[in-house]
């Protein structure tokens, strides 16, 4: 049996995307046709194992962009759906909608159940508020060359006093000496790889050397907020959450074309709207430039050795496909260094693009540049065949239908 998730298509048109309701066992098993397929992820907790304790005392916010109509219908979420809320959920949903981003903490058993319902549809999200010092997170920083960036990164991480593991991915001798000096100066443990294997293998080495139940991965060109782990760690109190990431924005210092581009189109910046990271939404993947992961939700090794680029996307997609929840919390912001060299800019994008074919092979139909709706295709087709009046009529119908769904505001 198939269920359909309504997705926003081209120019605000709406299309239906079928999703098979597969069992958890089917979702967690790797594709046997894949050569060197990664090991299956551990199964996520059952409803009983998950429980409800994680919601108690947790302030929630209404997710921006989600419409709430007639006291019972929501439009939006992740994945994007039109939902008629159960009667038991509506009173708390109304209160939370009115509170907005100011937040509201569920107080009764009924409100706790309603909160979980809203969280699981991406209609609400937990607000990232620190609850005190964190003692169950290790930080892993992979680095290759770029010792100066690492020094800034380690200085920013010092504020929370967490254990830090630096993994030098076989940097040249001069860089390696400076990396070792920086690690020692900040009290970080240093692992030196004998051979360069790429960021995924470096992260895996750091992950294996850590012992904490949660591991924060931070790229060496990141300048972290002073309390980013303390604020994001409570979101992992939900046993179903495998990973959570902050927003990563470009640290723009100048006005060059590359810097201005990075400020508005950085591949690491997933936007300002919180989201569950699932197929078919704007935040459909997360980079590991800054992310906290649950050890119990990862495979061994966590990052696929066969992927030198895109291994972070692969892991997040495998988590989603296995039934885990991955959250994006942009209220917390880290900054990444902008490299202004045109050569570096082009090389990085060529590198990212190089992972597309392998990711598509491992996750068929997830890596699609555009998902136009039938109405959108109708508009483009009419224009292509010289029928602007028909194109205008289709576009007008789509616009009117969307306005009816979303309401006047």
Language-model-detected regions and their locations in the chain:
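Conserved donor NDP-sugar-binding/catalytic core segment of glycosyltransferases
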Residues: 227-259, 337
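Glycine-rich, basic loop-to-helix element that forms the pyrophosphate-binding segment
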Residues: 193-210, 274-281, 318
């Amino acid at each position: 049996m198939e269920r359909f998730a309504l997705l926003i298509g081209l120019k605000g048109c709406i299309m239906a995307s079928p999703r098979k309701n597969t069992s958890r066992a089917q979702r967690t098993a790797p594709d046997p046709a894949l050569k060197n397929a990664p090991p299956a992820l551990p199964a996520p907790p059952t409803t009983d194992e998950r429980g409800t304790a994680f919601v108690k005392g947790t302030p929630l916010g209404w997710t921006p962009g989600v419409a709430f109509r007639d006291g019972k219908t929501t439009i939006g979420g992740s994945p994007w759906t039109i939902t008629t809320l159960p009667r038991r959920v509506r009173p708390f949903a109304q209160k939370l909608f009115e509170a907005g981003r100011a937040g509201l903490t569920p107080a009764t058993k009924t409100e706790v159940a309603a909160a979980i319902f809203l969280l699981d549809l991406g209609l609400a999200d937990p607000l990232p508020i620190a609850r005190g010092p964190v003692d169950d997170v290790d930080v892993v920083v992979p680095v290759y060359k770029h010792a100066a960036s690492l020094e800034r990164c380690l200085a920013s991480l010092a504020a929370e006093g967490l254990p830090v593991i630096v993994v030098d991915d076989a940097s040249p001798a001069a860089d390696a000496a400076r990396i070792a000096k920086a690690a020692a100066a900040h009290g970080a443990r240093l692992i030196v790889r004998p051979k360069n294997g790429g960021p995924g293998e470096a992260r895996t080495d750091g992950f294996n050397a850590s012992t904490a139940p949660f591991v924060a991965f931070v790229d060496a060109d990141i300048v972290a907020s002073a309390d980013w782990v303390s604020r994001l760690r409570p979101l992992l109190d939900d046993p179903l959450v495998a990973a959570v990431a902050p927003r990563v924005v470009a640290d723009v210092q100048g006005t060059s074309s590359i810097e201005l581009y990075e400020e508005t189109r950085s591949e690491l910046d997933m936007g300002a709207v919180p989201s569950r990271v699932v197929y078919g939404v704007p935040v459909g993947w997360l980079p590991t430039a800054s992310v906290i992961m649950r050890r119990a939700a990862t495979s061994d090794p966590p990052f696929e050795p066969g992927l030198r680029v895109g291994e972070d996307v692969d892991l997040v997609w495998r988590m989603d496909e296995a039934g885990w929840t991955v959250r994006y919390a942009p209220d917390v912001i880290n900054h990444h260094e902008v490299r202004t060299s045109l050569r570096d800019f082009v090389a990085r994008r060529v590198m990212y693009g190089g992972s597309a074919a392998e990711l598509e092979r491992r996750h068929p139909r997830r890596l699609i540049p555009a998902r136009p709706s039938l109405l959108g295709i109708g508009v483009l087709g009419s224009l292509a065949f010289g029928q602007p009046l028909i194109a205008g009529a289709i576009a007008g119908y789509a616009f009117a239908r969307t306005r009816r769904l979303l309401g006047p505001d």
